[in-house]
UniProtKB/Swiss-Prot annotation:
Protein name as it appears in the record: Regulatory protein cro
InterPro entries, per database record: Cro/C1-type_HTH, Lambda_DNA-bd_dom_sf, YdaS_toxin-like
Keywords: DNA-binding, Early protein, Repressor, Transcription, Transcription regulation
Positions of the DNA-binding region: 15-34
GO molecular function: DNA binding
Entry keyword annotation includes Transmembrane helix: no
Purpose: Cro represses genes normally expressed in early phage development and is necessary for the late stage of lytic growth. It does this by binding to the OL and OR operators regions normally used by the repressor protein for lysogenic maintenance.
Organism, as annotated: Pseudomonas phage D3 (Bacteriophage D3)
Pfam family, one: YdaS_toxin
Gene: cro
Length: 73
């Protein structure tokens, strides 16, 4: 799973740039890359929008029940 976060960082350039774009601390990005914790649904959605869909929210935050949310929207 950490591979997708490494690819996300590569997309933005650095962990600092990724953090700035996504509105989180650099230490949060480091935690994703190191597999310490996952990404929140809110940040996953933000990443999908900012990357024009290159990174899917479902892939960035697979534990969240996206299909349930879309069924009620």
């Amino acid at each position: 799973m950490t591979t997708i976060y490494k690819e996300l960082v590569a997309h933005f350039g650095t962990q600092d740039e990724t953090a700035a774009k996504l509105g989180v601390d650099q230490s949060t990005v480091s935690g994703w890359v190191r597999g310490k914790h996952g990404m929140s649904p809110v940040v996953a959605k933000r990443a999908q929008v900012l990357t024009d869909g290159k990174f899917k929210k479902e892939d960035l935050c697979p534990a969240f029940p996206w299909e349930v949310l879309s069924a009620v929207a």
